[in-house]
Amino acid sequence: MKKIAVIGGGASGLMAAITAAKNGADVTVFEKNDRIGKKILQTGNGKCNYTNLDMDDSYFYSSSDNGIIKKILSKFNEKDTIAFFENLGIVPRNRNGGIYPYPETATAILDVLRMEVERLGIKLSLSNTIDSIKEKGTGFIVNSTFFDRIIIAAGGKSAPKTGSDGDGYKIAKRFGHKPLKALPALTQLISNEKYFKSISGVRAEAYLSLYIDGRFIKKSHGELQLTDTGLSGICSFELSSLISRGIDSKRKAEVEINFFNDLSKKDFAELLRKRIKLQPERPAELLFTGIFNKKLSLLFLKMASVSLNKNSGSLNEKELATLSDSVCSFRVVISSVGDFAKSQVTSGGVPLNEVNENLESKKKKGLFFAGEVLDVDGICGGYNLQWAWSSGFSAGKAAAFD
């Protein structure tokens, strides 16, 4: 019976431990907190969107992927995840493809994982920081105990209050790995533009286009939240990993916002002409009434240098074009992103080209990785938890059988 140490008692670590134990291994989970699964409780705003029915590798980012993400997801996919938790007692709730536990509380997921850990006799070493890992023969000495295999599932640097502080990267470096710089992802976008204070609190459906050094990179869509420092909301979060990387490499990151149903500037200008024709005497201040929030409307007019008291019917073609440009092509230069304390996941980590298809290290046999410690981060919607389940399953099974 192989003795396996799992470093980290989060989602990927617990899945790795459970999988290894089911395959006959003697498993010990080392967790620096006084309880396991602390970060799980924060997922999905506490509701725990634990997977998604629309799942493939295109929803993940990695600057070192060589096809491994797709292979890992195929070994334990979203259907396997749903079945796994159903067998533990979770009834799934489908919300537009996002899968939640029926009571929509993360404690339900953590509770069944705890019960399975107990049922399988997995040992928990809590409030335990790893002081040393040494090689011994074909195995390892963790602190003072021998193990045949080690699975590093210590997470990244996001949400440090849950215990994620980059310890996994330090361990990886001891064995010759070169983790890519850890950066915040799934976090707010910060701009130096002063006008954001005037529109803080506004929410609007929008299409966002990301440009790095003037080159189009990616598009997203959803509810955008405007804050006093910039952009928030899922659609902006989905661009944050790429923006983080761009800014870190000293490139210009710019987001173009279309506030009106992805309509072209030409078509929106025509829409304005029709509105003006109906009520040409209406003051420009009221031109967007029924379309946009007042705060946003006033900003559009200000950016187009249009007087609030001017009759809509007297707006010239240049002013209409400028207004349409403000609405459909609102450009925001991003100066930075939210820090690790505000981010949901980490971009960067152990490069995928430094592990094999079972997530075993190419540098040291018997050393495996799972979860956020690897150079993989997904968008919002259950994708990062699916990566945790899939990678944990793959590492746990391989470690037990290797």
Language-model segments: residues:
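A conserved short coil-to-beta-strand element within the FAD-binding core of flavoproteins
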Residues: L126-G139
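N-terminal Rossmann-like FAD-binding beta1-loop-alpha1 element of flavoenzymes
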Residues: K3-V29, A395-A400
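Glycine-rich active-site loop/strand segments that organize a redox cofactor
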Residues: N45-N94
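An anion/pyrophosphate-binding glycine-rich loop and adjacent beta-alpha core
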Residues: T28, D34-I36, L41-Q42, Y50-D57, ...
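A glycine-rich dinucleotide-binding beta-alpha-beta segment and adjacent secondary-structure elements
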Residues: L126, S297-D377
